[in-house]
Amino acid sequence: MLETAELYFNVDHGYLEGLVRGCKASLLTQQDYVNLVQCETLEDLKIHLQTTDYGNFLANETNPLTVSKIDTEMRKKLCREFDYFRNHSLEPLSTFLTYMTCSYMIDNIILLMNGALQKKSVKEVLAKCHPLGRFTEMEAVNIAETPSDLFKAVLVETPLAPFFQDCMSENTLDELNIELLRNKLYKSYLEAFYKFCKDHGDVTADVMCPILEFEADRRALIITLNSFGTELSKEDRETLFPTCGRLYPEGLRLLAQAEDFEQMKRVADNYGVYKPLFDAVGGSGGKTLEDVFYEREVQMNVLAFNRQFHYGVFYAYVKLKEQEMRNIVWIAECISQRHRTKINSYIPIL
């Protein structure tokens, strides 16, 4: 017997949940990947993708076909699907989907700011921006010289505005400060998204909170790894860590003091969920920390579909689709560069 909350969920969101589950069922199978890695050219790859849910998404692309064109068209296809979900959603699912776009908006802003710093044309950089993170005021990013300028001129009317409260400063936006800004924005964003899911409760909280806890900890670990050998002080490093993960508070305090990968690994070894991930780094497969994080993310997102009546399936589907796209780009790059020895080093999903 369905509980009242579940009945209301079906009334408001049941159609879209059914739709996204159908989309998940159309992800590439292991047999599809076996066929893709046997392709000799990008044209062969295109022909095989036409037999999958991707269909004729490359029909309008002129020769020569490039990896970049394939990647761009896959992103556009995902964006069209997501826009359909968002355009037909009711609250609070609409807000949840808006939260999902914020990470792409942050990446786009940072991309545009770095482009302005390197004197690249806005048009050139806009072409590289993720379609899920596009917003009207993006082109004005190049006029901002400080975070305060950026907020006043560009972001005040966007969903990112609340995350800027901890980032306001008059520091010139050089390469280091832009990267610090990215991490501060992500920290505020993840903590706000986590609070939204936790406050929502029900199955959405059960599914999304562990996923966002993992994402917060992954960011803390990657920030730590990338800060070794840089000017970033240990105190500043700690201010960039999201506090909604399992590492909070003691693990984050220890990570802030870590001076090399081995010390970082010792911190992770204290947490049952992260020890096996670090143990898997290197070894016969030559996996990187990023590889094992992606594998863990895929596992969590696949499991999200085992539960019903929650918003997490929308998040999980987009993340799984992105991993599928990374896999296709990896295979396409190996084919394009005739570097087939590592063509099977993609991350399986189903």
From Swiss-Prot:
UniProt keyword list: Hydrogen ion transport, Ion transport, Transport
Coiled-coil portions: none
Alphabetized GO MF terms: proton-transporting ATPase activity, rotational mechanism
Organs and tissues of expression: Predominantly expressed in the kidney. Also expressed in the lung, testis, skeletal muscle and heart. Upr-egulated during osteoclast differentiation and is most abundant in mature osteoclasts.
One CC-aspect GO term: proton-transporting V-type ATPase, V0 domain
Pfam families (UniProt xref): vATP-synt_AC39
UniProt keyword Transport, yes or no: yes
Top-level taxon in the UniProt lineage: Eukaryota
Function: Subunit of the V0 complex of vacuolar(H+)-ATPase (V-ATPase), a multisubunit enzyme composed of a peripheral complex (V1) that hydrolyzes ATP and a membrane integral complex (V0) that translocates protons. V-ATPase is responsible for acidifying and maintaining the pH of intracellular compartments and in some cell types, is targeted to the plasma membrane, where it is responsible for acidifying the extracellular environment. May play a role in coupling of proton transport and ATP hydrolysis. Regulator of osteoclast fusion and bone formation.
Similarity remark: Belongs to the V-ATPase V0D/AC39 subunit family.
Subunit structure: V-ATPase is a heteromultimeric enzyme made up of two complexes: the ATP-hydrolytic V1 complex and the proton translocation V0 complex. The V1 complex consists of three catalytic AB heterodimers that form a heterohexamer, three peripheral stalks each consisting of EG heterodimers, one central rotor including subunits D and F, and the regulatory subunits C and H. The proton translocation complex V0 consists of the proton transport subunit a, a ring of proteolipid subunits c9c'', rotary subunit d, subunits e and f, and the accessory subunits ATP6AP1/Ac45 and ATP6AP2/PRR.
Protein name (database record): V-type proton ATPase subunit d 2
Species annotation: Mus musculus
Gene: Atp6v0d2
